[in-house]
Design a protein with these regions (language model features):
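Domain-level signature for proteins that mediate thiol-based redox and metal-cofactor handling
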Residues: 1-103
Length: 103
């Protein structure tokens, strides 16, 4: 059975096409949960985007789905808007530095 860390590692390969940073480093992936669905290992991934009007939403969601399938048999990507993404709170220190956000 896959672990949350394995799914996050797979998702780390997905980049925001505008920021050129990993969706995991940006803190866009909020949660990964597991369940058995029809005898298959299934993951539910809660993630958000940098903004509700993100022009690359479909591209990012599809890339996240494909990447997660490298770790689990079945996955559903849930697009959530709560909590609202804030790079000062959700992004890693390295991602904040790359975006020029200095605390």
């Amino acid at each position: 059975m896959a672990t949350k860390d394995e799914v996050l590692t797979a998702l780390d390969d997905v980049e925001d096409p505008e920021l050129k940073l990993s969706i995991v480093e940006l803190g866009l992936v909020y949660d990964v949960r597991f369940e058995s669905k029809e005898g298959k290992e299934h993951a539910e991934v809660d993630m958000t985007l940098t903004s509700p009007g993100c022009p690359a939403a479909a591209e990012i969601m599809a890339a996240a789905h494909r990447a997660a399938l490298n770790a689990v048999e079945s996955v559903h990507i849930n697009l959530v808007w709560s909590p609202r993404w804030d790079p000062k709170i959700h992004a890693s220190e390295d991602a904040r530095m790359d975006m020029g956000i200095w605390d």
